[in-house]
Amino acid sequence: MTTFLYLFYLSWSDDGQWDADIFNGHAIGCNAVSWAPAILPGSLITPQPQAAPGQTQSSPTSSVKRFASAGCDNLVKIWGYREDSQSWAEEETLEGHTDWVRDVAWAPNVGLPRSYVATASQDKTVLIWTKDTPTAPWVKTALDPSTSLAPTSGAPPPPGKFPDVVWRVSWSLAGNLLAVSCGDGRVTLWKENLKGVWECVSDMNS
């Protein structure tokens, strides 16, 4: 029998009370969650269609309720809030890691044309998940430290692998720079170049 650990969502209500939504999350456990930006990618810079006569103009910045969770089942799950049922539902499952997913970070999207989610794993990899439109599939890309980082000791890790467990990932406020914290005591900064390739632009030792 598979045991699922629960996700708890707390919201502040108008009557001054905390409301709790509880739902099944990941088998074994959940290590991290990250909220999606409150607006869709590109909605602030994309011209919106004009409303027909007699209709209300829809807001280009309507609120989005969505988050990602990182699990001990090696999966990343995308959750969305359904207004019709007033409940949270699993929208998508992202498969790519072979060990516990330690962290997940959804990038801020102001000015960005697509969604970016970074995940860090016990399997020594960092995956960048991109989604071009709300209906497009998620596409994953692995960061490759072997092309830019010298090993601290011993043999270099294989392509696509960091030297140790990757514990944390964090985006800059602009959403175009990713910090990666590895178990070997190094923090690296990564940026996507004009060709769509992720490059290490800074390397710091603790």
Where are these regions (language model features)?
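Structural hallmark of WD40 beta-propellers
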Residues: 1, 19, 40-46, 51-68, ...
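Conserved strand-to-loop turn within each blade of WD40 beta-propeller repeats
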Residues: 1-4, 29, 69-74, 119-123, ...
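Short loop/turn segments immediately following beta-strands, especially the blade-tip
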Residues: 11-15, 40, 80-87, 130-141, ...
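Residue-level recognition of a conserved intra-blade site in WD40 beta-propeller repeats
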Residues: 35, 60, 106, 110-111, ...
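C-terminal interaction modules of eukaryotic adaptor/scaffold proteins
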Residues: 157-206
